[in-house]
Curated annotation (Swiss-Prot):
Gene Ontology biological process terms from the UniProt entry: translation
The keyword Ribonucleoprotein appears for this protein: yes
Organism superkingdom: Bacteria
Quaternary structure annotation from Swiss-Prot or TrEMBL: Part of the 50S ribosomal subunit; part of the 5S rRNA/L5/L18/L25 subcomplex. Contacts the 5S and 23S rRNAs.
Family: Belongs to the universal ribosomal protein uL18 family.
Coiled coil: none
Keyword check for Chaperone: no
HAMAP family: Ribosomal_uL18_B
Gene name per UniProt: rplR
GO molecular function, one term: 5S rRNA binding
Protein name: Large ribosomal subunit protein uL18
SUPFAM superfamilies attached to this UniProt entry: Translational machinery components
Primary role: This is one of the proteins that bind and probably mediate the attachment of the 5S RNA into the large ribosomal subunit, where it forms part of the central protuberance.
Keyword terms: Ribonucleoprotein, Ribosomal protein, RNA-binding, rRNA-binding
Native species: Rhizobium rhizogenes (strain K84 / ATCC BAA-868) (Agrobacterium radiobacter)
Amino acid sequence: MASRKEALARRANRVRRQLKSVANGRPRLSVHRSSKNIYVQVIDDAAGKTLASASTLDKDLRGSLKTGADTAAAALVGKLVAERATKAGVKEVVFDRGAFIYHGRIKALAEAAREGGLSF
C-alpha cells in the first residue's frame, strides 16, 4: 500500500497529465492548500516561468484576514491572483487543483478567480 505522501503525488501527477492534454498553450493556475494558508500561481509551462502569484501570506491581504484557512480568505486570494494575472496579460488558464478535491477552499478560490476575470 502506498504511503499518504506517495498517493497525493500520484493523484497530483494524474491531474496534471490530464491538464497537459487540454491546455493548448494556456498557462496553468496551480493551487496549493495547507492547513493554515492557501497559495496560487499562474505558471507558463512552455517558458517555465511564473506569471502571477498570490497567497494568504501576501502583504496586501495579511492585515485584512482573520485566518488564512477559510473560504473567505481563499476567495480574496482568487480575486487577487485574477487581478495580477490580467495585469500580466493572461485571460485564459487551465485550473490545476493538484491532489485536492474541488470543494471548500479550492472551489471558493476558483469561483473568485472566475469572477475576477479569468476564464477556465
